[in-house]
């Protein structure tokens, strides 16, 4: 049985992605990232491999792809890369299926990720400078810009072990 990690009071939990869910996860990725045109993106300006089944399968095999669940419903996913010490985590990508947007699920997913890596004291991620939605989202969650480079804002959030 797969271990699940639940965010407090949210009902959402994450588990390592299951092989039979990859195609559904990729469909969600496509729908989620295609909504970026609504917040300043140009059509087709999506993350690398966002629509690749093979790449998502590889991420799952390597243990980086997590599926976000509410009860038995798959609502989104995350791709994360802990360092060898588990003290630092790079959040490569998160997405919530566009049919579930504007329900707080992105916040819940980030809470699940942070809860799933209790030894991590540093969380890092990046997002395009033009994307007002994601920049406001990460700042609202306590992430701070540490660098701007090549059209991307690089964010970091630190925490003291034992506090979330």
Where in this protein do the model-derived segments appear?
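A short beta-loop-alpha structural element at the N-terminal edge
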Residues: 12-27
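Conserved GNAT-fold acetyl-CoA-binding loop/helix
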Residues: 30-55
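A short helix-loop-beta-strand connector motif used in the catalytic cores of GNAT acetyltransferases and
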Residues: 53-67
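Conserved beta-strand in the GNAT
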Residues: 67, 73-82, 88-90, 95
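A short, internal acetyl-CoA/4′-phosphopantetheine-binding micro-motif in the GNAT/acyltransferase core
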Residues: 94-101, 127-128
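Conserved acetyl-CoA pyrophosphate-binding loop and the N-cap/start of the following alpha-helix
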Residues: 100, 104-112
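Conserved active-site alpha-helix within GNAT-family acetyltransferase domains
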Residues: 107-108, 129-147
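Conserved GNAT acetyl-CoA-binding A-motif
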Residues: 110, 116-129
């Amino acid at each position: 049985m797969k271990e699940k990690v639940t965010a407090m009071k949210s009902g959402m939990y994450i588990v390592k992605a299951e092989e039979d869910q990859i195609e559904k996860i990729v469909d969600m990725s496509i729908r989620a990232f295609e909504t970026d045109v609504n917040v300043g993106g140009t059509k087709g300006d999506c993350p690398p491999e966002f629509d690749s089944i093979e790449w998502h399968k590889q991420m799952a095999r390597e243990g980086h792809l997590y599926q976000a669940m509410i009860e038995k419903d798959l609502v989104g996913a995350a791709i994360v890369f802990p360092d060898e010490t588990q003290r630092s985590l790079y959040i490569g990508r998160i997405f919530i299926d566009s049919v579930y947007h504007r329900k707080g699920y992105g916040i819940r997913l980030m809470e699940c990720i942070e809860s799933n890596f209790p030894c991590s004291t540093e969380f890092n991620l990046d997002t395009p400078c033009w994307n007002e939605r994601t920049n406001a989202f990460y700042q609202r969650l306590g992430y701070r810009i540490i660098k701007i480079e090549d059209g991307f804002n690089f964010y970091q959030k630190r925490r003291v072990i034992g506090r979330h």
